[in-house]
Amino acid sequence: MSTAVVQADDLMEPSLQSIVSQDTLRWIFVGGKGGVGKTTTSCSLAIQLAKARKSVLLISTDPAHNLSDAFGQKFGKEARLVDGYTNLSAMEIDPNGSIQDLLASGEGQGDDPMAGLGVGNMMQDLAFSIPGVDEAMSFAEVLKQVKSLSYEVIVFDTAPTGHTLRFLQFPTVLEKALAKLSQLSSQFGPMLNSILGSRGGLPGGQNIDELLQKMESLRETISEVNTQFKNPDMTTFVCVCIAEFLSLYETERMIQELTSYNIDTHAIVVNQLLFPKQGSECEQCNARRKMQKKYLEQIEELYEDFNVVRMPLLVEEVRGKEKLEKFSDMLIHPYVPPQ
């Protein structure tokens, strides 16, 4: 067999068609450095998935919440249909929701004569002094909610790189918090529960045992989902970058971390590429294209077994259904620059 044929066979398709076609996928994460077009890519991928699947949910865990801006409609904590679609919904969640919000099932502590003692708050503070517990419980609560909804596939528009992979550590964080709370409960629980009475002094009138049960159920949810995250048939991670040194460096760091957690990643979307016409006299365009070409070659070399999608720098912002659909087509049908 000739070398040319081998290379043609080995060449990975420069599109996300394989992800859209893989009907076993349940979780798709889209991540990368800030400002590289993550939200545009995740919205566009969700649009393509909506053509192939019965129901798609797009979730933003980025505190900046750009989904509303991208689609030009307001989204919140509850999933709602995207205008113009019957099977694509979106929601924006705050990954740093407070423990009070998570555990409180009702208000009215002001009527409780024991609430002023602060013993419940002290227990809560001790239990949640472990870094990341707040975020872990919030994420687990979201997963619990999402699991109860019957969406075929869920696309996460994640926070910038530094925060993207925190969810992988959440089961461990929750286990630590549970161990700490169990220890406190076995030592002081019966005494505190009897002192505080049936109100328990914790948010929503829960006692310490109920708090433990709540955390245990969240830990089980997040552990179960994390097992799915490590299954390449069910989960994949799409990296988004631009052809610049820092973005490429972040992408490499992220891919190494994903690999260490056994999370599948085999697609990179390279945004904002310049394609100056032959003979163009725009010096800046040509200089930038030369730089981008260098980093593109590095990406092709480093990730030869990845689907590398090349997306052009557009003259207008990608906002609104029409422009997102146009952009989403280029994720599937590779962009051909005009000659």
Curated annotation (Swiss-Prot):
Pfam family, one: ArsA_ATPase
One of the GO BP terms on file: response to heat
Enzyme class name: hydrolase
Positions annotated to bind ATP: 33-40, 244, 271
Gene3D superfamilies given in the database record: P-loop containing nucleotide triphosphate hydrolases (3.40.50.300)
Keyword Metal-binding: yes
Residues annotated as catalytic: 62
Predominant location category: cytoplasm
GO molecular function annotation: ATP binding; ATP hydrolysis activity; guanyl-nucleotide exchange factor activity; identical protein binding; metal ion binding; protein folding chaperone; unfolded protein binding
Listed EC numbers: 3.6.-.-
UniProt-annotated binding residues for Zn(2+): 282, 285
Any one cellular-component term (Gene Ontology): GET complex
Entries under InterPro entries matching the protein: Anion-transp_ATPase-like_dom (IPR025723), ATPase_ArsA/GET3 (IPR016300), ATPase_ArsA/GET3_euk (IPR027542), P-loop_NTPase (IPR027417)
SUPFAM superfamilies in UniProt: P-loop containing nucleoside triphosphate hydrolases
Keywords per UniProt: ATP-binding, Cytoplasm, Endoplasmic reticulum, Hydrolase, Metal-binding, Nucleotide-binding, Transport, Zinc
Localization, UniProt: Cytoplasm; Endoplasmic reticulum
NCBIfam families: GET3_arsA_TRC40
Subunit structure: Homodimer.
Function of the protein: ATPase required for the post-translational delivery of tail-anchored (TA) proteins to the endoplasmic reticulum. Recognizes and selectively binds the transmembrane domain of TA proteins in the cytosol. This complex then targets to the endoplasmic reticulum by membrane-bound receptors, where the tail-anchored protein is released for insertion. This process is regulated by ATP binding and hydrolysis. ATP binding drives the homodimer towards the closed dimer state, facilitating recognition of newly synthesized TA membrane proteins. ATP hydrolysis is required for insertion.
Family: Belongs to the arsA ATPase family.
Protein name: ATPase get3
Organism: Aspergillus oryzae (strain ATCC 42149 / RIB 40) (Yellow koji mold)
Taxonomic classification: Eukaryota, Fungi, Dikarya, Ascomycota, Pezizomycotina
